[in-house]
Swiss-Prot record:
Signal peptide: none annotated. Keywords: Aminoacyl-tRNA synthetase, ATP-binding, Cytoplasm, Ligase, Nucleotide-binding, Protein biosynthesis. GO terms for cellular component: cytoplasm. Its EC number is 6.1.1.19. This is Arginine--tRNA ligase. One of its GO terms (molecular function) is arginine-tRNA ligase activity. InterPro entries: aa-tRNA-synth_I_CS, Arg-tRNA-ligase, Arg-tRNA-synth_N, Arg-tRNA-synth_N_sf, ArgRS_core, DALR_anticod-bd, Rossmann-like_a/b/a_fold, tRNAsynth_Ia_anticodon-bd.
Length: 585
């Protein structure tokens, strides 16, 4: 039950059935009416902007219209009181029996509460991580990995059919560099002295075991056979080894993709997928032969002062046309990207989501252009850019140097602080905002550490049930037993917690609509904080404690409140990819 949506519908229905019309007698446009929690909880339980958004079209001032709307709602038995806040917002306070019924509904739905049927089975492809297979995942990949995974879980929760996809960039120059870097480590494993890693090769020590493995498998054969053949063998082994490493890194974060799509597949059969893509674009008038001026202040790697095969991407919103085939007949990276999008489009997804690093900001327009050209403007495309993660230790920056091969890996972070803190904290800022990750803060046992505070709330809830079992000498308390006594929940603090719980479906809906899973993390912390605040009041006032040894019925009612909190913490944390704690260790 979404309390806010239900009251929005009530208000709209009341207006539709009323004699309130526009200035010229026309029906009202009710689409901008919303019902939300008031900014100040002391102002009521619900607040609507109905009078504010309709006043001008009706020809009344907002306050006068608010009075008319209040008149329409005055006979609603669920409303305790209703008033107007300047200049025309309507604040509503609901009855305690309404909130008792609300928590009854929550308990009946269990962990399915908040599971709004928004997706209706529509198919969405979410591509995330897609790190180059040239080494272990570093902490910079971590944020996009968590964002993509939680967004996928969130969309799945409300009924979308999700495909989690990883694009393996295994056909570009970086693979050549990787192969030469591994060959160097191979020669080192054979006993050759390697003084310094040449500029441009990967210097990380993570390649040493691969060099040793090749030496064990091939002895010195790779130095005696044809160089191209040796390089081909090393490439295959290196890509396999790097992707195995990356899969293990992702598994450490509890991330598992459905599909790993190899870029090399696009080049199979004489690059048939790319050729077919260019043919399709040609038929639709997007391909021509020509020259491009050198890009100002940008990478000129794909620029040549010669005739090339160009994609007329400016026709579909790009800043400049893009090279697909160079003058020597070789394909650009972008040609493979367009072919990859075409492959996705031909798999008939209703929407395609790309999650990229902030350094890909300049890539968004060409992505959108290729989507319009390939799909005839029918594809729904969403692109998200995840900003950088800055590492700190006790407030001091952690220095990293990719050139020196010294960077903090994803596995390093997970092994030091644990999977759950990493997942939660990577989500604890909007993805477009930079994120500071302090190793000390995320392991701190205080309210300033969001994941600790949320898990502590879950553990405390479980402890209340254990206390009830001990005091009342019962093995468990059934849902029906708790529901039967919910009318005993009358304290304002209890009603406040029920109101906080009732926001969950609204938070889920907003997080899905805006594709902002950080809203869920914020809500879970907010709910945990409200719970802890009530718990602390019980330390000062025995009557507010959840278990009342001399009043079993009140205790059962409060256990119902605890169960509802547990259900939502468990549900929300599951979407984040975290198991709710039953006790703190």
């Amino acid at each position: 039950m979404n309390v806010f949506k239900n009251f929005e519908k009530k208000i709209k229905k009341s207006l539709e059935l009323s004699d309130i019309k526009g200035k010229n007698g026309e029906d009202l446009n009710l689409s901008k009416i919303t019902v939300d929690p008031p900014r100040d909880s002391s102002h009521g339980h619900l607040s609507t902007n109905a009078a504010m958004v309709l006043a001008k079209s009706i020809g009344l001032n907002p306050h006068a219209l608010a009075e008319k709307i209040i008149e329409l709602l005055k006979n609603d038995s669920s409303i305790d009181c209703i008033d107007i806040a300047a200049p025309g917002f309507i604040n509503i306070k609901l009855t305690k029996s309404f909130w008792q019924d609300a928590i009854k509904s929550m308990l009946k739905k269990g962990t399915s509460y908040g599971r709004i049927p928004m997706g209706q089975g529509k198919r969405i492809n979410v591509e995330y991580v897609s790190a180059n297979p040239t080494g272990p995942m570093h902490v910079g990949h971590c944020r996009g990995a968590v964002f993509g995974d939680v967004l996928s879980n969130l969309l799945q929760f409300v009924g979308y059919n999700i495909t989690k996809e990883y694009y393996i960039n295994d056909a570009g120059k970086q693979i050549e560099v990787l192969a030469h870097s591994v060959l160097l480590r191979y020669r080192e494993a054979l006993g050759q002295k390697i003084n310094e890693i040449p500029e441009g090769l990967y210097p990380g020590e993570y390649l040493i075991p691969l060099g040793q493995s090749l030496a064990q498998e091939f002895s010195d054969q790779l130095l005696t056979i044809d160089k191209d053949e040796a390089l081909s063998i090393v490439k295959e082994r290196a890509i396999y080894a790097m992707m195995s490493m990356i899969r293990k890194d992702l598994a450490a974060l509890n991330i598992y993709h459905d599909i790993f799509f190899s870029e090399r597949m696009l080049y199979a059969d004489n690059a048939r997928a790319i050729r077919n893509t260019i043919n399709d674009l040609t038929l639709n008038g997007y391909i021509y032969k020509g020259e491009l001026p050198p890009p100002k202040g940008q990478n000129t790697e794909d620029w040549e002062p010669r005739e090339q095969t160009l994609f007329r991407s400016t026709d579909v919103g790009d800043d400049q046309d893009r090279v697909l085939v160079k003058s020597d007949g070789s394909y650009t990276y972008f040609a493979a990207d367009v072919a990859y999008f075409r492959d996705k489009f031909n798999r008939h997804f209703d929407e395609m989501i790309y999650i990229l690093g902030a350094d890909h900001a300049g890539y968004v327009k060409r992505l959108e252009a290729m989507a319009k050209a390939i799909s005839g403007n029918s594809a729904k495309l969403s692109v998200f850019l995840c900003q950088l993660v800055k590492l700190f230790r006790n407030g001091h920056p952690v220095r990293m140097s990719k050139r020196a091969g010294s960077f903090v890996t994803l596995r390093d972070v997970v092994e030091e602080v644990g999977r759950d803190p990493v997942r939660f904290m990577m989500l604890y800022r909007k993805c477009e905002a930079p994120l500071d990750f302090d190793f000390a803060k995320v392991t701190e046992q205080s309210k300033d550490n969001p994941i600790f505070y949320v898990q502590y709330a879950s553990a405390r809830c479980h402890s209340v049930f254990r206390q009830a079992q001990e005091i009342f000498r019962i093995e468990n308390v059934s849902n029906d037993t708790m529901i039967a006594h919910l009318n005993r929940l009358t304290d304002d603090n209890e009603i406040f917690l029920i109101r906080k719980l009732s926001e969950y479906p609204r938070i889920i809906e907003q997080a899905v609509v805006h594709k902002e899973p950080h809203r869920l993390a914020f809500y879970l912390y907010d709910l945990a904080s409200s719970f802890h605040a009530h718990w602390n009041k019980g330390s000062d006032n025995f009557d507010l404690r959840f278990i009342q040894p001399d009043d079993k019925e009140l205790s059962f009612a409060r256990l119902g409140l605890i169960q509802a909190i547990m259900n939502i913490l468990s549900s929300g944390l599951a979407i984040v990819g975290i198991e709710a704690a039953t006790e703190m260790r």
